[in-house]
């Protein structure tokens, strides 16, 4: 017997909560229906945290349901206050339009052609402010809005009318999509629960229809820290912003405690295979991390890129010494590092080796004698010639 969709999502750690869960389960078993996920184009690329929603959309799509992707070209002009302690910087319409085009291309890679794209600027810009106050205003309780996490955390620091209206506009998005496309379910991250419920409640008040909202877990490590952040920034899905190799290496260096969670949430491996991999002990756990790195790089960048990243990682770290990785502060000059680590005896020799092409970092030749090392989540293998290698971890300078 095929496992029902909500049970599958729960098993994979992707389900947090839903309103009217019993009724939603019945609806999912009745046949194809329309659902939506939304992304505000506040950056030129989606990141790994956004991929959780895309992966859930893929699961729904594989079971015959129709994904609608809302690109928040209108709401991005305001900015979602959720999880923020300060007012977002205003973005230009030109930047938002460019980001929207880029993100739409990215999403097509994951959802293919059987997806409906919508941009909320097309209907939000037509709203008349007086009509909004008259028609939508009575449907929202300011007391309830201020009690939500998104707003309560900002109350003492100051909350603008612009930000307060974000929830109203997102709720209206759900209402509009329900009226035009028959969308019956909104899926979002767990931090969007209040906004999702506001949309479902607006539809109930305006149409007397029951619609559904569901939230997924956010991608966080076992210690609660948000995953996908590194010393060099977010883990982007755009290969120009985060290379497939750097993406691969991020998962190679994932902490052991978070391994099973990521396998379940973001890969399609069956649970028994995941359990076997995550039960590996000691040095063998590296096999599980290599499997995770390959599976995710394959899913995001394709098999060819995953194979290239895998091969590059194997080449680089085949030279990695067995000795402990050395720690270096960001901002340290490379010539000083290789002297301190004993690869050369003096700074003049260090410069000469670099100028002659005899020094590599991760098998890439170094030519800049003035190079300064930057903080990185990935270790660096520094090599002199073909036989001498040391591994360093560059950490942020907190002084």
Curated annotation (Swiss-Prot):
The keyword Flavoprotein does not apply. ATP binds at residue 229. Catalyzes the attachment of tyrosine to tRNA(Tyr) in a two-step reaction: tyrosine is first activated by ATP to form Tyr-AMP and then transferred to the acceptor end of tRNA(Tyr). It catalyses: tRNA(Tyr) + L-tyrosine + ATP = L-tyrosyl-tRNA(Tyr) + AMP + diphosphate + H(+). It is found in: Cytoplasm. This is Tyrosine--tRNA ligase. One of its GO terms (biological process) is tyrosyl-tRNA aminoacylation. Residues 332-395 form the S4 RNA-binding domain. Keywords: Aminoacyl-tRNA synthetase, ATP-binding, Cytoplasm, Ligase, Nucleotide-binding, Protein biosynthesis, RNA-binding.
């Amino acid at each position: 017997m095929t496992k029902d969709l909500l049970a599958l999502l729960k098993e994979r750690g992707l389900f947090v909560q839903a309103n009217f869960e019993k009724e939603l389960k019945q609806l999912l078993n009745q046949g194809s229906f329309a659902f939506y996920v939304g992304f505000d184009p506040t950056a030129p690329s989606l990141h790994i945290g956004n991929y959780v929603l895309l992966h859930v959309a893929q699961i729904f799509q594989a079971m015959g349901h129709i994904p609608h992707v809302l690109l928040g070209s209108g709401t991005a002009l305001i900015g979602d206050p959720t999880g923020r302690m300060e007012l977002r910087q205003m973005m230009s319409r030109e930047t938002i339009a460019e980001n929207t085009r880029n993100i739409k291309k990215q999403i097509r890679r994951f959802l293919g052609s059987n997806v409906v794209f919508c941009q909320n600027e097309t209907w939000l810009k037509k709203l008349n402010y007086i009509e909004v106050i008259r028609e939508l205003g009575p449907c929202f309780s300011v007391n309830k809005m201020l009690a939500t996490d998104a707003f309560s955390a900002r109350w003492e620091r100051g909350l603008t009318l612009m930000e307060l209206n974000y929830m109203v506009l997102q709720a209206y998005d759900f209402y509009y999509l329900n009226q035009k496309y028959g969308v019956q379910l909104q899926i979002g991250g767990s931090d969007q629960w209040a906004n999702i419920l506001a949309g479902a409640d607006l539809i109930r008040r305006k149409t007397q229809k029951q619609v559904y909202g569901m939230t997924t877990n956010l991608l966080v490590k076992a210690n609660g820290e948000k995953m996908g952040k590194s010393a060099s920034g977010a883990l982007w899905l755009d290969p120009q912003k985060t290379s497939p190799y750097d993406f691969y290496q991020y998962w190679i260096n994932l902490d052991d405690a978070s391994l099973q969670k990521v396998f379940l949430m973001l890969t399609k491996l069956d649970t028994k295979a995941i359990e076997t991999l995550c039960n590996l002990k000691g040095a063998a756990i590296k096999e599980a991390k290599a499997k995770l790195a390959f599976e995710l790089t394959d899913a995001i960048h394709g098999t060819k890129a995953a194979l290239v990243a895998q091969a590059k990682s194997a080449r680089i770290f085949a030279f990695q010494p067995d000795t402990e990785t050395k720690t270096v502060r960001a901002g340290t000059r490379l010539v000083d590092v290789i002297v301190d680590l004993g690869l050369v005896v003096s700074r003049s020799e260090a410069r000469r080796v670099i100028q002659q092409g005899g020094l590599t970092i991760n098998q890439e030749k170094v030519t800049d004698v003035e190079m300064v090392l930057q903080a990185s989540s990935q270790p660096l293998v520094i090599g002199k010639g073909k036989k001498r290698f040391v591994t360093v971890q560059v950490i942020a300078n907190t002084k």
